[in-house]
Amino acid sequence: LKGLWLKIHRIMAEGEAEASGRRKLKLDLGSLTEKNMGQLKKLNTATFPVKYKDQFYLDLVKYFEFCRLGFYADVLVGSICCRLEDRTDGGKALYIMTLSILKPYRQRNLASQLVQWILDRAQSKECQDKDVREIYLHVQTSNKTALAFYKKFGFKVTEKIEDYYHNIDPPDCYVLRRPMNGHDLTHEVLDINP
């Protein structure tokens, strides 16, 4: 265990040292399982300002096929967790619940690899058969970096929700959507520039 922590700290130090150069790194993607759920909990604690309740992790068991862990040098440095939902106007949607990257590894193309994975997954035959029509997520209105990031992947701002978040300032969020599998966006697009 001590050896693993030394390896993690060495890799984090390397990540911080290389971050200024922003060299792109390649993730090894792995499945989320009940056995490695504890690693995801630790990653989320390190990367998010809110603490996810145990129920969040219990619910993830239903959505393992839409979650991926990202490893660099055998250390968990990022993840994406999505769930499949019914849409009110028919078909299904994939909701991005969390996308996380450890701070020393940000701006290294890792989040892009995770988002590209879910975009590819949404276009798979299995998801087409499930009638997946869009991917969507919530982004805090002050998070200009995230807004610009998702727009690069074709997401559009379709709604602003006031007081969405609790114990975070500002509490408001935008809903970002991206149509999938030949479907059109069924929501009005708001003109929000990050």
Q: What spans do the regions from the language model cover?
A:
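Conserved G/P- and acidic residue-centered "switch" motifs that form tight phosphate/ATP-binding loops
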Residues: N109
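Conserved catalytic-core motifs of GNAT/GCN5-like acyltransferases
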Residues: Y136-H138, K151-V175
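C-terminal interaction modules of eukaryotic adaptor/scaffold proteins
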Residues: L1, D169-P179, L185-V189
